[in-house]
């Protein structure tokens, strides 16, 4: 995979000022972003998150998922610590794209859960790839993370690319009546570590 650094700029946010680093995956043409704060290249494990693009949750305030809540929570946690990195990866809809995500939502409106909808459309349950993270983190001088995630697949993916996950930091945000079944399905079928609140609810909620 050929991922190249393009440019960096300041990014003031309600949480504080970050530096925004732009990267281009030359094979896919996708553009990815890293947001950093503080000195993250000192060798100590860095508080971090891999966040896949979610237009509906991140920008349109959807309550169907927890993505927007997790994005805000991760940025707030980094700002509180004064040091950290968030990789914003262009992998909408767990890798199936925005329009297919809307198609999946339509199937969910008809009774399918989030995994069943993907499978009915001919996709895998989760088609995301995290190979781009290694060159992005290497450019930033980061080799060890305290990773904010509930998804064990992200931990395994980073470790397979020789990035140390020194700690998994749970990031449980935004549970509501609209996403309860979605989160239960992620726990029950995708192995997300969401605690006893969601375990076993996929079939009953």
Curated annotation (Swiss-Prot):
It is an enzyme of class 3 (hydrolase). It catalyses: GTP + 4 H2O = 2,5-diamino-6-hydroxy-4-(5-phosphoribosylamino)-pyrimidine + formate + 2 phosphate + 3 H(+). One of its GO terms (molecular function) is zinc ion binding. The keyword Nucleotide-binding applies. Zn(2+) binds at residues 54, 65, 67. Pathway: Cofactor biosynthesis; riboflavin biosynthesis; 5-amino-6-(D-ribitylamino)uracil from GTP: step 1/4. InterPro entries: GTP_cyclohydro_II (IPR032677), RibA (IPR000926), RibA-like_sf (IPR036144). Keywords: GTP-binding, Hydrolase, Metal-binding, Nucleotide-binding, Riboflavin biosynthesis, Zinc. The active site is at residues 126, 128. One of its GO terms (biological process) is riboflavin biosynthetic process. Its cofactor is Zn(2+). GTP binds at residues 49-53, 70, 92-94, 114, 149, 154. Binds 1 zinc ion per subunit. One of its GO terms (cellular component) is cytosol. Pfam families: GTP_cyclohydro2. Disulfide bonds: none annotated. It comes from the Bacteria. Its EC number is 3.5.4.25. The keyword Zinc applies. Belongs to the GTP cyclohydrolase II family. Catalyzes the conversion of GTP to 2,5-diamino-6-ribosylamino-4(3H)-pyrimidinone 5'-phosphate (DARP), formate and pyrophosphate. This is GTP cyclohydrolase-2. It comes from Pseudomonas paraeruginosa (strain DSM 24068 / PA7) (Pseudomonas aeruginosa (strain PA7)). The lineage of its organism: Bacteria, Pseudomonadati, Pseudomonadota, Gammaproteobacteria, Pseudomonadales.
């Amino acid at each position: 995979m050929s991922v190249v650094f393009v440019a960096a700029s300041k990014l003031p946010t309600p949480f504080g000022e970050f530096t925004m680093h732009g990267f281009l995956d030359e094979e896919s043409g996708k553009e990815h972003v890293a947001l950093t704060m503080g000195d993250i290249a000192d060798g100590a494990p860095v508080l971090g998150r891999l966040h896949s693009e979610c237009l509906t949750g991140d920008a349109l305030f959807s309550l169907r998922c927890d993505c927007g809540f997790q994005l805000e929570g991760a940025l707030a946690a980094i700002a509180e610590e004064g040091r950290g990195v968030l990789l914003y990866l262009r992998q909408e809809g767990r890798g199936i794209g925005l329009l297919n995500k809307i198609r999946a939502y339509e199937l969910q409106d008809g009774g399918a859960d989030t995994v069943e909808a993907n499978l009915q459309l001919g996709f895998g349950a989760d088609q995301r790839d995290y190979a781009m993270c290694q060159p992005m983190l290497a450019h930033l001088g980061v080799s060890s993370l305290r990773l904010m995630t509930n998804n064990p697949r992200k931990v395994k993916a980073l470790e397979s690319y020789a990035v140390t996950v020194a700690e998994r930091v749970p990031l449980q945000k935004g549970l509501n009546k609209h996403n309860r079944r979605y989160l239960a399905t992620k726990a029950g079928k995708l192995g997300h570590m969401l605690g006893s609140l969601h375990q076993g609810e996929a079939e009953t909620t």
